[in-house]
Regions:
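Serine-hydrolase catalytic-loop signature spanning alpha/beta hydrolases and amidase-signature enzymes
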Residues: 68-71, 93, 137
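C-terminal catalytic histidine-bearing segment of alpha/beta-hydrolase fold enzymes
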Residues: 247-318
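Primarily recognizes the serine-hydrolase "nucleophile elbow" in alpha/beta-hydrolase
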Residues: 136-208
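Short amphipathic alpha-helix adjacent to the substrate-entry channel of hydrolases
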Residues: 73-96, 103-105, 240
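Alpha/beta-hydrolase active-site loop
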Residues: 113-144
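N-terminal cap/lid segment of alpha/beta-hydrolase-fold proteins
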Residues: 23-56
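The feature captures the conserved acid-bearing segment of alpha/beta-hydrolase catalytic domains
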Residues: 178-249
Length: 318
């Protein structure tokens, strides 16, 4: 097949809404983990019913939805079968809210490069803070939920993937965000569906990151595959750039040539067993591997991949 190489804040309410999905034998509970001004932030926890009474601590997948920091839902129907698949595989799945700071901003305020970069940075910072609060909530309830706080895997789609990767990047660089989390905490892994990190200048890693699984299409016009930089300062640095930086680290990199932003959701259906392999081998098994998979479609020979920062702004202002 083509080319292949071996590359959470205390609860603000005791509210808990429980839904049992009998057909799938999945228990779903909803919790409020933070109230921030007008925003009530919730998370949904999915777990196999027959595992609730077990004694073994389980690993956790903490998921952040996509939506361009303008919208999106933690309970998007398109995600549910992926959550159930992971729950049946023995994981506790937590899908979290975060504030979407771009939803109420007048587009004219960030139609230029500087305005867009400033608004985007603020939105990412806000989302990452909420993701950290959701992480803390999980850790604080680890005994009650019978989960292993050392096995929390961050996962996200598009804007949610940026959020998950950015959280890991902040931890590795010991920023103020890391101080919001328990001392010496790190995620056990990150799974990114079309994500990137935001940095002023070329990203630097003070500490090595946890194992990363990066899905991205090289024709993505929404989130840069390699980079989108404003005057060589603030920029989004995509999966390809991250992977080139971390090529000697534990990374599973999945490229789809000629494919756009559909890799922000398609792996949740099409690559489930690749994801389980990454979790079992590189995260839980702690294997030292760099895994690269390049998917080629012979019917796609010519496509646009050289997008400018202006292209990304236009796409994200739709």
């Amino acid at each position: 097949m083509g080319k292949r190489f071996i590359f959470i804040l205390m609860a603000c309410s005791l509210l808990s809404i429980t839904t049992v999905v009998h057909a799938q034998h999945i228990d779903k509970q909803t919790y409020i983990f933070a109230i921030k001004k007008v925003d009530t932030l919730k998370l949904d926890k999915y777990v196999m019913i027959d595992q609730i009474q077990g004694t073994q601590s389980k690993p956790v997948i903490l998921f952040a939805f996509g939506g361009g920091f303008k919208g999106g839902r933690r309970d998007n129907p398109d995600y549910i079968s992926y959550f159930h698949f992971l729950a049946r595989a023995g994981y506790v799945v937590v899908s979290t809210d975060y504030r979407t700071q771009l939803k109420d901003i007048d587009k004219s305020e960030y139609s230029d490069l500087q305005g867009f970069s400033s608004a985007l940075q603020q939105a990412i910072t806000c989302a990452v803070e909420d993701f950290g609060d959701a992480t803390n909530y999980i850790i604080e309830h680890s005994v009650e939920w019978q989960i292993n706080p050392a096995q929390i895997i961050a996962c996200g789609s598009s804007a949610g993937a940026i959020t998950a990767l950015q959280a890991e990047y902040e931890i590795c660089n010991q920023t103020a965000f890391a101080d919001r989390l328990p001392a010496n905490f790190n995620y056990a892994g990150v799974i990114s569906f079309s994500g990137a990190i935001c940095a002023n200048g070329i990203p630097k890693w003070i500490m090595s990151p946890c194992p990363l699984m990066l899905f991205h299409g090289d024709a993505d016009s929404t989130v840069p595959f390699t980079k989108a930089v404003v005057e060589e300062e603030m920029g989004l640095w995509g999966s390809n750039f991250i992977c080139m930086q971390l090529k000697e680290k534990e990374t599973a990199y999945y490229i789809a040539e000629g494919i756009g932003h559909s890799l922000s959701y398609s792996p949740m259906k099409d690559n489930r067993h690749d994801i389980l392999s990454f979790l079992n081998r590189l995260v839980l098994g702690k294997e030292k591997r760099c895994i690269t998979t390049v998917e080629k479609n012979p019917e796609i020979s010519r496509y646009k991949s050289d997008f400018t920062i202006e292209d990304y702004i236009r796409e994200n202002m739709r």
